[in-house]
Structure formats: structure tokens, C-alpha cells
């Protein structure tokens, strides 16, 4: 059986069959390459999270207010039993004027220290807005410069990664085609284009033998 056009008609469907089978494997192998690239931007978004916690600082200022308010409470409790004792002494000895004056003198110094913590509260309250104001002013400039530079490298990385990912995919497709289809393609080309030469050679060879 000499190869001729009939061989091309017979083998061409086989060549088409082997040509379209490996194309599915190329798509399956290129899929995980694209999936790995999608995981990279997640790391960039996780960086600005710890920097936001620096703003929470005015908490200790509130604790000082509670301490100042709690200080005068025991002074008022001590003044109440002293006044009751003075009233009891006056009821028992109404004739004596000197002890009542001594008790009144003892009651007066107790009322004086009650006004001192109130005076201490006024400067503390005046200092609070001064301390709270710079905290808010310092927090505002921190948030502005952090958000702007984060978006720029993401866009640059996406532009740089897109052309790099296309080249290896093309190389893999070419290598796979040469490994799977290249051999069949070369055989088909030689059989189709040079089958008539082989045919003439066989005819010439038989003609030489017969002569």
C-alpha cells in the first residue's frame, strides 16, 4: 500500500482528534496560576489594622474625675456626726455658754476643708478640655496620610503582575503543543506533502527491479 491522498483522507480525522484533546489540559493547568495571584492583595489590606488602635488614649483622664468627686464624700459624712454631738451637748448643758462656743469653734474648721476639694475640682475641670483637645487634633492628621498611599501600590502591583502572568501561560501552551500535537502534526505534514514523492520512488524502485 503506497501512501497517497487516500492516506491523508484516512489520517486527517485522527490528527484532528489528537489536536483537540490536549487543549482541555492546558486550561486546567493554567487555572491554579490565576488563583494564586488573587491571594496577594489580601496581605496588603491587613496592614493598616493595628495602627488605628493608637487613638484610644483619653481613658485615663476620665478616671481622674472620678477620684476627685469621690474625695469630698467622706468629709460630709464626718461633718454630720460632729453636728449631732454638738446638738446633744447643747441640750444637756443649756446654761454653760463657753462649751457651746468651743463646740461651734470645733464645727467651723470642719466646714472649711469641705470647700477645698471644690476649688481643686475647678482647675481640674478647666484642664480637661485643654488635654482632650490636642488628642483629637493629633488623631485627625494620622488618619489622612495612612489611607492615601495604600491604594497606590495595589494598582501598581496589579499592572505589573498582569503582563508577567501572560508570558508563562503562552510558553506552557507552546511546550504542551510540541509534546502532544507537534509529533502528529509533523507526521501529517510529511505524509500529505511528500506522499506523492514516496509514491514515485516506489514505482521507480519496482520498475528498476523488473528491468
From Swiss-Prot:
Keywords: Repeat. Sequence repeats lie at residues 56-61, 76-81, 84-88, 92-97, 107-112, 115-120, 121-126, 127-133, 136-140. It comes from the Eukaryota. Residues 114-167 are annotated as: Disordered. Stolon, also expressed in leaves, stems and roots. The keyword Protein biosynthesis does not apply. Residues 56-141 are annotated as: 9 X 6-7 AA repeats of E-E-P-A-A-A. The keyword rRNA-binding does not apply. Residues 114-152 have a biased composition (Low complexity). This is Induced stolen tip protein TUB8. It comes from Solanum tuberosum.
